């Protein structure tokens, strides 16, 4: 064997090794400096352990060969095991928990699942933009902190349905982030210091343990909350809790679930926030690149909402992000160790047990690959035509192979969206134009001290921005659209021959594509179908029918359910495939240049060499730049179907009888519940917006259109037919051991207005027909007490009966609440149903004048979601939560209801002044009054004076329709006087917390208007009306009939 060379490096000192060669605050920079001094491979000694660093593309290419090397958990990552244990990132090679978790979680990060997360990603991205817009262009923005908030909120919402609301809670970072930053920094430091030094740092160790306990406790709480309140969603948290390993059949232990929750919360946001921060740093340093990027975003996305389909059409944004990660890989190293002693670079021996760190900030600037300007920011080199020509393993910021980043697609989609959205929304500038890049190190890297200013483009205001959906479009995902059977677009139906589909799929994408293709071919007459994983085709490929294969490559290898099939083809032991007719469709991602389409190509070639007949040219879909389903449809039309017709159904075959395509015939009727109420008409939601900021009780604006005219006037009402909240329905189902689709039929007549002799699902019954939240009656309490065998619970129920007003009615305790509290009660479902009133309509005031926007109406309402007064979970308002659940295009059922005659505008608005007094959503009818006055003015009619007194918490939280009212005020339609309970010293509130106080500041004006026969309208709670009346009577004397109230 050729003599091996020793690995160079700085000379270590006894005991401390190379500790003094390392800057403990900037350890990475110290290592990079050594790389420039000692060359492509060097070593140092830390804590008595030899650490080897590789810094060239050639060495990286060798080290990424998974047949020779595998991941090693060393240094700071090993110290991080105190927190994340055997989670996906910190697990040792071959650790059993890693295998179980990896196989369970792979489908959760497939391309289709990531696409489905786009809307939630957009939600958080919009929050960032709203914050920057409202802060104004003079605000200095700590871009790293804001991107940290963004990425942590995104991973929590998209994968676990949990809102951290980091932009609203305070200026401080979320406690999880504070703990994470400490743990990451401490893990890195502990990995550098000698063991004896770490033992002496008792306070630091205790602080580390405290932060670890806090983070694992937060993860445990997420688990407990989801188990206590299950949600029927296909998210990561449910996958962690309920998923089963397809090989062993095992689920994950709670300890492993907690470790992986922490792994995702850290890895899912820390490196992505760094990527975004570095990307915007480089953009502001390179104005020509910034301008080209913005032009690409403007051209592709236009003025409408950004959709997930746009992202694949932004190649320059993609290149910018890749170049940013090349120069500043936010996870700056990963470590491997050899399976057996290996010679590296032809001259260095790497022994078993040695660890080699791939030092990415140097590897990815290798001048032999990227040229003499490798240290410069040049996005063009990352455009596909150049990127695809790079040597293998030249760009590795996401790690390697099976231990590479499982969430790469998630992070990339999120970052693409944020870059595009920010560029389209803002003009950006560095706060300090002379800022020099500094690096903040933990186990990851970020810019240190980099701040920007953001100005809305095109002179747009923050209010205008918030009134438009700036990000997400409701573009349908092909994976979830419905395919209606039928002979569409004149396509010919093929014959009734059988067909077999085989797929190879780890993440579920190729399986979904296979089922989509099978469904479309079903409509063409291929009704005898077999769909199975590729491994089931070993020694089982049919010869009397077409075989369609859809598969992909996973880290250069077959998917788990295709390994046996590929090995069978490669072994040469497979029999001749003469008579097999097949077609292959392959999926891939262009960033894996070395293995792009490797397995689909291999299967196609091996089957052909074994004698099988190709039906069609191999199809291909690139997940990086195209829509997989659209590519599949094109391949089906242009390649597969022509091949099938030619090979299986010759034109002269007289025995060929085309199957009649399946025609789907349906009828659609109104819900049965609608027919049980009088005069309900159908309305369609046309606009939705939230009127408040987090921190204030939520209030919403809902607009809808109805067919035909009505006789409604400003001040009138609408009856709304709601449904019960899904969580309340789930509680009722669970109490009576019913599945949602259990069928219930009422055979006998009953006093309740329920469907007779017609099956209704249990979920529909509890959702649409019964008042589940109605407070229990005294008789209900007596009946419950009579059915319990427990003397103790019987006495408690009778005590509630005796204290009914204070303990039941005042606390809104329902029969369902009591059944959950008193578990010994054995109440039949028939009795439960008989106890409950029928679900009734709810009444809301119109908040839009009927003539203001013909055929359109709106409601302004508070969403009631608060801790239950009886201490049992949360109390959800039935109608308000129903209205809050509606989406654009949703159908609801309403009926007009006139208000009392007095609660309308005076017939002559020219001479009759009005005074309107309200708080919160009590503004609704007065908004319709003011709009009607605006229409009156537009007819060149004079208007008498109008005053609006409006109370809320603060201008930032819940000053409803502020800008709109300001426009009406500027037009002379109304004068507005505000009171702010949280900020009474605000200049608009004149020191007043509540509207009754604000009335006193306008005493003279009110008295003058009263003398001119003004009408006073009040809309709000009973307490508000009482306080207002007391003030007005002290000011005006007896109010008589010109004082009109509407209490809710």
From Swiss-Prot:
<dbReference type="InterPro" id="IPR036396">
    <property type="entry name" value="Cyt_P450_sf"/>
</dbReference>
<keyword id="KW-0479">Metal-binding</keyword>
<dbReference type="Pfam" id="PF00067">
    <property type="entry name" value="p450"/>
</dbReference>
<dbReference type="GO" id="GO:0043386">
    <property type="term" value="P:mycotoxin biosynthetic process"/>
</dbReference>
<keyword id="KW-0349">Heme</keyword>
<feature type="domain" description="Flavodoxin-like">
    <location>
        <begin position="499"/>
        <end position="640"/>
    </location>
</feature>
<dbReference type="GO" id="GO:0003958">
    <property type="term" value="F:NADPH-hemoprotein reductase activity"/>
</dbReference>
<dbReference type="GO" id="GO:0005829">
    <property type="term" value="C:cytosol"/>
</dbReference>
<keyword id="KW-0274">FAD</keyword>
<dbReference type="InterPro" id="IPR017927">
    <property type="entry name" value="FAD-bd_FR_type"/>
</dbReference>
<keyword id="KW-0813">Transport</keyword>
<comment type="similarity">
    <text>In the N-terminal section; belongs to the cytochrome P450 family.</text>
</comment>
<protein>
    <recommendedName>
        <fullName>Self-sufficient cytochrome P450 monooxygenase CYP505E4</fullName>
        <ecNumber>1.14.14.1</ecNumber>
        <ecNumber>1.6.2.4</ecNumber>
    </recommendedName>
</protein>
<dbReference type="InterPro" id="IPR017972">
    <property type="entry name" value="Cyt_P450_CS"/>
</dbReference>
<dbReference type="GO" id="GO:0005506">
    <property type="term" value="F:iron ion binding"/>
</dbReference>
<dbReference type="GO" id="GO:0050660">
    <property type="term" value="F:flavin adenine dinucleotide binding"/>
</dbReference>
<dbReference type="Pfam" id="PF00667">
    <property type="entry name" value="FAD_binding_1"/>
</dbReference>
<keyword id="KW-0288">FMN</keyword>
<keyword id="KW-0503">Monooxygenase</keyword>
<keyword id="KW-0408">Iron</keyword>
<feature type="binding site">
    <location>
        <begin position="505"/>
        <end position="509"/>
    </location>
    <ligand>
        <name>FMN</name>
    </ligand>
</feature>
<dbReference type="InterPro" id="IPR023173">
    <property type="entry name" value="NADPH_Cyt_P450_Rdtase_alpha"/>
</dbReference>
<dbReference type="InterPro" id="IPR008254">
    <property type="entry name" value="Flavodoxin/NO_synth"/>
</dbReference>
<dbReference type="InterPro" id="IPR023206">
    <property type="entry name" value="Bifunctional_P450_P450_red"/>
</dbReference>
<keyword id="KW-0521">NADP</keyword>
<dbReference type="InterPro" id="IPR003097">
    <property type="entry name" value="CysJ-like_FAD-binding"/>
</dbReference>
<keyword id="KW-0560">Oxidoreductase</keyword>
<dbReference type="Pfam" id="PF00175">
    <property type="entry name" value="NAD_binding_1"/>
</dbReference>
<dbReference type="InterPro" id="IPR039261">
    <property type="entry name" value="FNR_nucleotide-bd"/>
</dbReference>
<dbReference type="InterPro" id="IPR001709">
    <property type="entry name" value="Flavoprot_Pyr_Nucl_cyt_Rdtase"/>
</dbReference>
<keyword id="KW-0285">Flavoprotein</keyword>
<comment type="function">
    <text>Self-sufficient cytochrome P450 monooxygenase that catalyzes the regioselective in-chain hydroxylation of alkanes, fatty alcohols, and fatty acids at the omega-7 position. Performs hydroxylation of C10-C16 n-alkanes and C12 and C14 fatty alcohols; and thereby enables the one step biocatalytic synthesis of rare alcohols such as 5-dodecanol and 7-tetradecanol. Converts 1-dodecanol into 1,5-dodecanediol as major product with very little sub-terminally hydroxylated products with the 1,4-dodecanediol and 1,6-dodecanediol more abundant.</text>
</comment>
<dbReference type="InterPro" id="IPR001433">
    <property type="entry name" value="OxRdtase_FAD/NAD-bd"/>
</dbReference>
<feature type="binding site" description="axial binding residue">
    <location>
        <position position="405"/>
    </location>
    <ligand>
        <name>heme</name>
    </ligand>
</feature>
<dbReference type="InterPro" id="IPR001128">
    <property type="entry name" value="Cyt_P450"/>
</dbReference>
<keyword id="KW-0249">Electron transport</keyword>
<dbReference type="GO" id="GO:0010181">
    <property type="term" value="F:FMN binding"/>
</dbReference>
<dbReference type="GO" id="GO:0070330">
    <property type="term" value="F:aromatase activity"/>
</dbReference>
<dbReference type="InterPro" id="IPR001094">
    <property type="entry name" value="Flavdoxin-like"/>
</dbReference>
<feature type="binding site">
    <location>
        <begin position="584"/>
        <end position="616"/>
    </location>
    <ligand>
        <name>FMN</name>
    </ligand>
</feature>
<dbReference type="InterPro" id="IPR017938">
    <property type="entry name" value="Riboflavin_synthase-like_b-brl"/>
</dbReference>
<dbReference type="Pfam" id="PF00258">
    <property type="entry name" value="Flavodoxin_1"/>
</dbReference>
